Amino acid sequence: MKKIFLLFIIFALGSCVAPQQNPNFEKNVELTKAWFENWENEDLDYLSSKIGESIEWQGAFYANKEYFTTKEDVVAYISGWLAAMEDINYEPENFLPGVDPETSLPNGSVRTYGTWTGVNTASGKPFEVKFYHYLTFDDNGMLVNGGDYGDATGVVMAVAPDPES
């Protein structure tokens, strides 16, 4: 009985080991914070300079089934948002570690949930919407994978200029 109890204790203690954090996670959180700060500053040059030549980006618009796979396409996607909105602000709720989809181990990527606010440039209508984002950086701090999840189409429709009667 003592041996069974001892084995149980050893098993219980062994299963309490916390998973190891990827050593790049904290650095990538800082890169992510800078990414969103420059969205708020509408600094397309900075944002463009942080996108890798090899990229996969999932946009958030309705029927957007394909990843953007070129830097130019991702920059055009961002540019469209920046042209349509002003006074942009992202208020993150958190920055969470991402995992490799094949191994389920922390891979240094960053996930964040937060609230975007701003004003539509054409209509002057304000918006407030929750989004989820994921960003993966390479060893040089370049964005190589990312995406947005939220109701982008709904936001655009909600703040569009009113039709003229």
Predicted segments with their positions:
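Hydrophobic pocket/interface hotspot
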Residues: W35, Y46-S48, I55, V74, ...
